[in-house]
Amino acid sequence: MLLLGLLLLTSALAGRRHGAAAESDLSSKFSFPGAKEQNGVQDPQHEKIITVTSNGSIHSPKFPHTYPRNTVLVWRLVAVDENVWIQLTFDERFGLEDPEDDICKYDFVEVEEPSDGTVLGRWCGSSSVPSRQISKGNQIRIRFVSDEYFPSQPGFCIHYTLLVPHHTEAPSPSSLPPSALPLDVLNNAVAGFSTVEELIRYLEPDRWQLDLEDLYRPTWQLLGKAYIHGRKSRVVDLNLLKEEVRLYSCTPRNFSVSLREELKRTDTIFWPLCLLVKRCGGNCACCHQNCNECQCIPTKVTKKYHEVLQLKPRSGVRGLHKSLTDVPLEHHEECDCVCKGNSEG
């Protein structure tokens, strides 16, 4: 009997160990790559420092053949001379896993400015070769990431060379990058774009996909609200005539307002530049008040929030800070004609 009990206990323990192993295998099988960090180079434990004294190159593993899966590699190029720049030129043979919705989410190569953490660009796919990149100091960082699916070929190869900065005359405003333009000049340029994709591509031609992904990443902030207009009842012709007078006299109507002027903000740019709001407008020719002059004023005002893109210069850092923000605007819900001078109360 004792021997039988020991055999049963041993069998139960073995079953528990097997179940735990199966659960571990199952959880690893269904783990998703989306949980890994997406922006910037945040893997210093993987970083390989390369001292740059002459021209050279780095490349994805097995280049120009298919690179391995589940790989994270980070290189930091450091020039010995602190007064030089590092130029990166991508080999014409470039191919990584294709983007999803024009955004590099899975396999990509990314270049970062170590001095301020600015991501200069993220690239994937094979439709075009990334443009040349130049550091603003004597260091630059490169990061390569591949997930567990769909490795591609040939990968990438980046040739690096040293550049000696040469000082020239100050560039004209037309040749400056968008982030270096005066806000008033940039505001005029921003006004010409009809979609947010065109705007972000103009501001960040090499990293616009990454910025767009960050911009639309879900947050807990309050979303802008819409408002609804009720239909007017029309019974007979006289009522119709009277209603038309009411509609086109002192009533809430669409007005476009400049956000910078409305919010009295000269330190930032909003896109779109203008929004539609409801404001009282029209005349008071048929004012029912016994006075010589009537004016149209709001009798019910509400504040509504609208989600817009905000562009703000970074203090001491190159580039613009881009974020989705809610701006409060007044909307006139109801209006009335009152005697001029009696609008208070």
From Swiss-Prot:
Post-translational modifications: Proteolytic removal of the N-terminal CUB domain releasing the core domain is necessary for unmasking the receptor-binding epitopes of the core domain. Cleavage after basic residues in the hinge region (region connecting the CUB and growth factor domains) gives rise to the receptor-binding form.
Site (Cleavage): 225-226, 231-232, 234-235
UniProt superkingdom: Eukaryota
KW Metal-binding (keyword) present: no
Disulfide bonds listed in the record: 104-124, 250-294, 280-335, 287-337
Glycosylated residues (UniProt): 55
Signal peptide: 1-22
Compartment list: Secreted
Biological process (GO), any one: positive regulation of cell population proliferation
Annotated keywords: Cleavage on pair of basic residues, Developmental protein, Disulfide bond, Glycoprotein, Growth factor, Mitogen, Secreted, Signal
Family note: Belongs to the PDGF/VEGF growth factor family.
Chain's role: Growth factor that plays an essential role in the regulation of embryonic development, cell proliferation, cell migration, survival and chemotaxis. Potent mitogen and chemoattractant for cells of mesenchymal origin. Required for normal skeleton formation during embryonic development. Required for normal skin morphogenesis during embryonic development. Plays an important role in wound healing, in angiogenesis and blood vessel development.
Subunit details: Homodimer; disulfide-linked. Interacts with PDGFRA homodimers, and with heterodimers formed by PDGFRA and PDGFRB.
Protein name according to UniProt: Platelet-derived growth factor C
Native species: Gallus gallus
Gene (name only): PDGFC
